[in-house]
Amino acid sequence: ARGVMKALDICEASERLFGIALSGGDYTKDLQTHITGTGLELMGARQNMIIAARAAGVQCFDTVYTNLDDMEGFRHDVETIHLMGFDGKSIINPRQINIVHEIFTPTQKDIIFAEKVVKEIDEKKAQGIGVFTVDGKMIDIAFYDGAKRTIELAKASGVYKGDL
């Protein structure tokens, strides 16, 4: 629990540090609870860790999912941490690899939207326009880095065919 409370200090402790990871087992032991499979017992720690990591500009990785017979629960857990902004998931079994890759690899829909956002922001910025819509969604400069990150992840995953 102390590590979670000191997450920002840990993230800023060294320029050589590139990321942090949550240990669900240690955390639940400290809180005198147990891992349930729902992830509720880890939610506060996960939020604190990802906020600290982002504030410090480092990556954040989630804890292992220990119930190897519950692949549906594992999938839900990975979807949750992906939506929270984690960079990855620690795994303990080869059967878990494909699910993590599937969830963390941008879809073609994600890629197409990200390309539109990047191109539109570049064009609108040159015209002095700060807020506009893409596919009916309000967009401003705050969305630029996320769109670029989607494209970079697509490139790293080998699924990007675009020209950005």
Model-derived features with residue positions:
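Expand to "…catalyze enediolate/carbanion chemistry for C-C bond making/breaking, isomerization
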Residues: 1-164
